[in-house]
Regions:
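Extracytoplasmic/secreted proteins, especially bacterial periplasmic and envelope-associated proteins
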Residues: 78, 82-85, 109-113, 126, ...
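C-terminal cap of thioredoxin/glutaredoxin-like
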Residues: 2-24, 154-226
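Tryptophan-centered motif/residue detector
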Residues: 70, 86-87, 138, 151, ...
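Structural microenvironment flanking redox-active thiols in thiol-disulfide oxidoreductases
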Residues: 90-120, 124-153
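Alpha-helix capping and helix-coil boundary motifs
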Residues: 5, 33-39, 139-144, 205-210
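Extracytoplasmic thiol/disulfide redox context detector
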Residues: 2-106, 179, 220-226
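Solvent-exposed, acidic/flexible segments
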Residues: 62, 72-79, 104-111, 120, ...
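Residue-level detector of secondary-structure transition/capping positions
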Residues: 81-84, 91, 122, 135, ...
Length: 226
């Protein structure tokens, strides 16, 4: 009896693992890590809260547009420029703020402390593009402390100063604020937009049409037809 060739099954198994990993990574990159495919099918593009629900909202500013984003969100990264242009069109008295998703157990929430700490340090916007690139292009896990500390050092951010800021009252308050908003509005995908406490919008059209839609909600309390 001839010897069996064990190489072929091993090769097929290795190929299967590689292909499976590639598919899983693509799904994580292009689908929000906070929502399963089934959940995404159930999400509505626009939800209006009742007056009672809006009044109980943890959002501090009633005349505001808030984006709930995540560093690991591909669509958040590519739309930064569009959001800057939209923010420049906001009328006087209206504010725009970006907050990181913060939900227990959500994979994309693992960098909420990084966002909050750098924000309190006053340097978050300066490093945001680099963080997007590190996570989405270089696949660096900045949610792991040791890896994050190495990245901080590489980018000339004082690790001791970061650690001190991360335990400050200001950082904890910001984390609590983000967690309350993420939970209250049941944010299940990023980016999610909260308008004047009462509207929750997901992107349902391309920019700049989506900017017009958000600005209409901010200024006129009126959604635009697609």
């Amino acid at each position: 009896m001839g010897k069996r060739n064990f190489k072929t099954p091993v090769i097929y198994a290795a190929l299967f693992i590689i292909i499976s990993c590639a598919i899983a990574f693509a799904a994580m990159k292009y689908l929000s890590p906070t929502a399963s495919t089934a959940d995404k099918d159930e999400l509505q593009d626009l939800v209006q809260l009742s007056a009672t629900e809006a009044a109980a909202s943890p959002v501090e500013d009633s005349d505001s547009l808030i984006e709930i984003f995540a560093y690991g969100c591909h669509y958040c990264a590519i739309n930064e420029d569009n959001l800057s242009k939209m923010a420049a069109r906001l009328p006087a008295g209206k504010s725009f703020r970006q907050l990181h998703l913060s939900l227990p157990g959500a994979a994309s929430s693992r960098t909420d402390t990084l966002f909050a700490t750098l924000t309190v340090m006053g340097i978050e916007k300066q490093y945001r593009e680099k963080i997007y690139h590190a996570i989405n292009e270089e696949h660096i896990d900045l949610g792991t402390q040791a890896v994050r500390d190495m990245w901080l050092q590489k980018n000339n951010i004082d690790v001791a100063a970061f650690d001190k800021a991360s335990t400050s009252a200001q950082t904890q308050a910001l984390l609590n604020y983000m967690a309350k908003i993420s939970a209250y509005y049941k944010v299940r995908g990023t980016p999610t937009f909260i308008i004047n406490k009462k509207w929750v919008a997901l992107q349902d059209r391309t920019y700049p049409a989506f900017s017009d839609h958000l600005l209409s909600l901010v200024e006129k309390d009126l959604p635009l037809e697609k």
